[in-house]
């Protein structure tokens, strides 16, 4: 995830809360073919809705160094699918928390030690850059950890699965699916890749906060959720999925591939929550702010975001603060583009977030596992309440 600067070419990024998506609409201007006089591979990126540009991979990283968010829509152009954002929400979420007596005991089982152990290992890979061999190795390790959690819970006996979602660039995404009584699905997401923007293929990118913190946060929430016998046995009303996306740093490539496939398969996704950067609090404290969970209020679903605030109030020991990150700041953008209600939580207000990301210094030593535990509580409460929601 990146702190977005004010984009002169993206005035629509400040238009307030946006939500669901109308698919299959033609863009205002159909993207033109890339210039042919350069030999470098070109990628079509979108910096705001329908504001596109052809760039090289190096130019992608230059934009990110400048704090500019984008989504890589090269493949979308090839399919002829042009979704568009619009205001409003088509899913109604519970106005109150209805399962506190079940959720609170599960929250007590969440472990900071588990998250620290997992993050220590996850950051030991030289880089998790999605085109690197160590990015594939880190994905294999994460897949084995997710598989262990599913297996140890007994959920596999009732149909729970873990899938490697393959991509052309090597590093796969991971999907853990816990079936419920219907195919209506709630998704919890984080991105597993990391990047060093100075030399992505060479320099170390431990990515402790971005987004190792979100990765182990939702992993621990999955483990905690599977302490529920009702969830394990598939007695929840809805199916729950946990996603670990590849190639977010390349422009939400992994999550786009998944949600575009879900759209083709006519999957009924009722909610998607992204956790990107959940561990850094010192910036907020240095600014004289109280520790709080940052909840995005731009380019998200308004109804789902209100529900997320309610979950935070009910199940977390700290409050929330509204913040904005602009267009295409993390994988919830992909869900929204393909018509699914999405929300996002992060560690603080964006202006106080971790400035060491995308460097060799994005290290565990700067993170608060107490804060990450609050995000795990949020994730578990969100998942359980919506698992039993009547949509």
Curated annotation (Swiss-Prot):
Zn(2+) 2 binds at residues 210, 249, 358. Residues 1-19 form the signal peptide. Keywords: Aminopeptidase, Disulfide bond, Glycoprotein, Hydrolase, Metal-binding, Protease, Secreted, Signal, Zinc, Zymogen. Its EC number is 3.4.11.-. Transmembrane segments: none annotated. Zn(2+) 1 binds at residues 191, 210, 276. GO terms for molecular function: aminopeptidase activity; metal ion binding; metalloexopeptidase activity. Binds 2 Zn(2+) ions per subunit. Its cofactor is Zn(2+). InterPro entries: M28_fam, Peptidase_M28. SUPFAM superfamilies: Zn-dependent exopeptidases. It is found in: Secreted. Residues 20-91 form a propeptide. Monomer. This is Leucine aminopeptidase 1. It comes from Aspergillus niger (strain ATCC MYA-4892 / CBS 513.88 / FGSC A1513). The lineage of its organism: Eukaryota, Fungi, Dikarya, Ascomycota, Pezizomycotina.
């Amino acid at each position: 995830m990146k702190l977005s600067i004010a984009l002169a070419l993206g005035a629509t990024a400040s238009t307030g809360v946006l939500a669901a998506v109308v698919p299959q609409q033609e863009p205002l201007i159909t993207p033109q073919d890339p210039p042919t006089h350069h030999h470098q591979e070109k990628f079509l990126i979108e910096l705001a809705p329908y504001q596109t540009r052809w760039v090289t991979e190096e130019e992608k990283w230059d934009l990110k160094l400048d704090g500019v968010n984008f989504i890589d829509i090269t493949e979308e152009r090839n399919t002829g699918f042009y979704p568009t954002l619009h205001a409003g929400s088509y899913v109604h979420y519970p106005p109150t928390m209805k399962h506190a007596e079940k959720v609170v005991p599960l929250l007590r089982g969440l472990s900071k030690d588990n998250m620290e152990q997992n993050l220590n290992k996850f950051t030991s890979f030289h880089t998790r850059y999605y085109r690197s061999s160590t990015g594939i190795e880190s994905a294999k390790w994460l897949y084995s950890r997710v598989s262990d959690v599913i297996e140890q819970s007994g959920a596999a006996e009732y149909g729970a699965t873990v899938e490697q979602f393959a991509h052309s660039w090597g590093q796969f995404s991971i999907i853990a699916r816990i079936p419920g009584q219907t195919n209506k699905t709630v998704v919890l997401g984080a991105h597993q890749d990391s990047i060093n923007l100075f030399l992505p293929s060479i320099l170390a990118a431990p990515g402790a906060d971005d987004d190792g913190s979100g990765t182990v946060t939702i992993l621990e929430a999955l483990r905690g959720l599977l302490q529920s016998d009702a969830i394990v046995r598939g007695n929840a009303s809805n199916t729950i999925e946990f996603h670990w996306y590849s190639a977010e740093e390349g422009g939400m490539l992994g999550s786009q591939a998944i949600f575009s496939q879900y759209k083709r398969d006519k999957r009924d996704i009722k909610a998607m929550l992204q956790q990107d950067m959940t561990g850094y609090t010192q910036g907020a404290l240095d600014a004289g702010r109280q520790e709080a969970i940052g909840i995005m209020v731009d380019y998200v679903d308004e109804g789902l975001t209100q529900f997320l605030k309610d979950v935070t109030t009910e199940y977390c020991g700290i409050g929330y603060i509204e913040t904005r990150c602009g267009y295409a700041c993390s994988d919830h953008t992909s869900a929204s583009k393909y018509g699914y209600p999405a929300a996002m939580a992060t560690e603080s207000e964006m202006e106080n977030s971790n400035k060491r990301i995308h460097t060799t210094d994005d290290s565990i030593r700067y993170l608060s596992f107490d804060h990450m535990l609050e995000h795990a509580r949020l994730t578990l409460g969100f998942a359980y309440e919506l698992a039993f929601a009547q949509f």
